[in-house]
Every structure is written in structure tokens, then in C-alpha cells.
Regions:
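N-terminal positively charged helical leader segments and presequences
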Residues: 1-131
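Short, hinge-like loop/turn segments at secondary-structure boundaries
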Residues: 114-118, 184-189, 232-236
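RNA substrate-binding interface of SAM-dependent RNA methyltransferases
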Residues: 73, 81-83, 95, 134-223
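Short glycine-enriched loops at secondary-structure junctions
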Residues: 103, 123-125, 171-175, 244
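General small-molecule cofactor/ligand-binding pocket signal
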Residues: 96-100, 196, 259
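Structured adenosyl-cofactor binding patch, chiefly the S-adenosyl-L-methionine
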Residues: 63, 162, 184-188, 249-288
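Active-site/ligand-binding-proximal alpha/beta "capping" segment
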Residues: 216-271
């Protein structure tokens, strides 16, 4: 059995029995306010209630961790396996499915290329640091100090989930939230990564250290290379700074150690999402 088939089987075991054939999509009505029932108008946390893109919507339904209010398809899409799977998953979970003409669909979608699928769901749970540490695995937390580009944040979350990061810590201010662009770029990673937020990252680093987490900041000016770290067993947090500015002074001062990814070319630094991917996989390899 493939990994994908096993995940589908697990999803079905959690879902209510589906004794009917897949229902036909409903045609949208002008009076239906799509997404208005979502808590996004009152949610002050990390959001994530608007999901666009085929893989992101598929993972939302497959994870089954939060209520999905509706799935909306652009009318006239060519058939594909992933679209069929989204319809099947929606039917299994009794999620309403609608089809929309191009003009109305474009008025609801917010990303540049939603791939003909939009879904509205309950916002992501805004967790606490203690929640990130309550894991059966060795805690490996990614701390992001002010990422402002949604595509960068989405790419970082995708790489982090693939590398086995057990939780992510974000600041409540001066950082992008989990927008539709973040969710789409993350390709469903937000459904599997516990995400917490704090009022300030320096405070978050201090709280992690109080709870026995070793904190490593990533900075191009560090003396120690990331390949020299000994990170086998202890709970660990990897701290990355914002695009352009890097780690803030207070965040840097509160980390136990500052490390760098060595650069061998002429350009002095990597994109933050690329640096995050390299660092996460390097640490993950050392902790296996």
C-alpha cells in the first residue's frame, strides 16, 4: 500500500460512513455569501481559513483536523485525479461543493493562480508554546522572526514539514499571517504543522530556553557553521530572521548559539526560504 493510499484509508476511518454516491456540485446562487460564515472576520490569530489551490485543499480535507465549510470549483474544469479526489473527500466529510462561473469565482479567489479550487474552513488553532512541546517526537521547533513575504513563509512551512519540524513559532505582529498565498505555497503543510504565536520572538526564545529547549539562530555573520553543530537528542529551536534584516538584535542575544550556512559564491546571502530548507534538513539528518 502506498503512503497516499494509506492516508486515504486513515481519513475514511475517521470520517462518517459514506453510503451514497458522490453528490453533484451545486450551482452557486447570488444570495449565498461564500466564506461569510467563516470566522475570518473576527479571528485575530494566525488565520488560515481561506485555502486555495488543489494540493492545499486536498490536504485540508485529508487531514480532517478542522471544519471545512465549503469547497468551490471553477465551472468547466478539465477532469483530473486530484480534482476527483477532492470531490470524494468532500463527499466523505459531507462538505458542500459548489461550482461557479469564471466571473464570480474570480471575485472570491485571492491568489494569482487558485487552480480552480477555493475552500473556506475554520481558522487554524492559535497554539501556545507548551502545545509545541507536547509531542511524542523530540521537539524540533522553527522560530520565524518577522517573515513578511507570504510566498517565503509558505515555502518555509512546506520545507519544514517535509524535514520533520514538530512545530512553528510566529510573532503576532510585523509578520505575515497564514494568508491564502501562504497556504497555497505551503501545499498543505499548515494542516500538519502545529503553529503557535507570541507577542514577540525574543520573549518566545526566552520561554523556550526556560523549558529546556536549545536555541540556535541562523545568521550569515556567525563564526560557527551549521554543519558543526551537535544536535542529536536535546529539544531544539532553529531561529530565522526576516528577509533583508536577518535576526533582530534581541533575538540574536537570547539564542544559545548563532550559526551560519557557508557561502562559496559571490552573492553574500541566501533567500530565507532556501536557508530554512537547508538548515532544517541538515538538523533533521543529524537528529535521525
Amino acid at each position: 500500500m502506498t503512503k497516499k493510499q494509506n492516508r486515504r484509508k486513515t481519513h475514511r476511518s475517521r470520517s462518517a460512513p459514506n453510503t451514497h454516491q458522490r453528490p453533484k456540485s451545486k450551482t452557486s446562487k447570488e444570495k449565498h455569501d461564500f466564506g461569510k460564515s467563516s470566522a475570518r472576520t473576527t479571528n485575530k490569530g494566525i488565520s488560515g481559513d481561506v485555502i486555495e489551490g488543489r494540493q492545499a485543499v486536498r490536504e485540508l480535507l485529508l487531514a480532517g483536523k478542522r471544519k471545512v465549510r465549503e469547497v468551490i470549483f471553477l465551472a468547466g474544469l478539465d477532469p483530473s485525479p486530484v480534482l476527483a479526489e477532492i470531490r470524494d473527500l468532500a463527499a466523505e466529510s459531507r462538505v458542500p461543493v459548489y461550482e461557479m462561473a469564471r466571473s464570480k469565482f474570480d471575485s472570491i479567489a485571492t491568489t494569482e493562480s487558485p487552480q480552480g479550487v477555493v475552500s473556506f474552513a475554520e481558522p487554524l488553532l492559535n497554539l501556545e508554546i507548551d502545545d509545541l512541546l507536547s509531542t511524542k517526537k523530540k521537539p524540533f521547533i522553527l522560530v520565524l522572526d518577522g517573515i513578511v513575504d507570504p510566498r517565503n513563509l509558505g515555502a518555509i512551512l512546506r520545507s519544514a514539514e517535509c524535514a520533520g519540524v514538530t512545530g512553528v513559532l510566529l510573532p503576532r505582529h510585523r509578520s505575515t499571517k497564514i494568508t491564502p498565498t501562504v497556504a497555497k505555497t505551503a501545499q498543505g503543510a499548515i494542516e500538519h504543522l502545529p503553529i503557535a504565536s507570541v507577542s514577540g520572538i525574543p520573549k518566545g526564545i526566552s520561554l523556550l530556553k526556560e523549558k529546556g529547549v536549545w536555541t540556535v539562530g541562523l545568521d550569515t555573520n556567525a563564526q560557527t557553521e551549521i554543519y558543526e553543530l551537535g544536535v542529536a537528542d536535546e529539544p531544539l529551536a532553529l531561529v530565522l530572521g526576516s528577509e533583508g534584516k536577518g535576526l533582530g538584535r534581541l533575538s540574536r542575544e537570547r539564542c544559545d548559539l548563532i550559526a551560519k550556512i557557508p557561502i562559496f559564491g559571490s552573492i553574500e546571502s541566501l533567500n530565507v526560504s532556501v536557508a530554512a530548507a537547508i538548515a532544517c534538513f541538515e538538523i533533521a539528518q543529524r537528529r535521525r
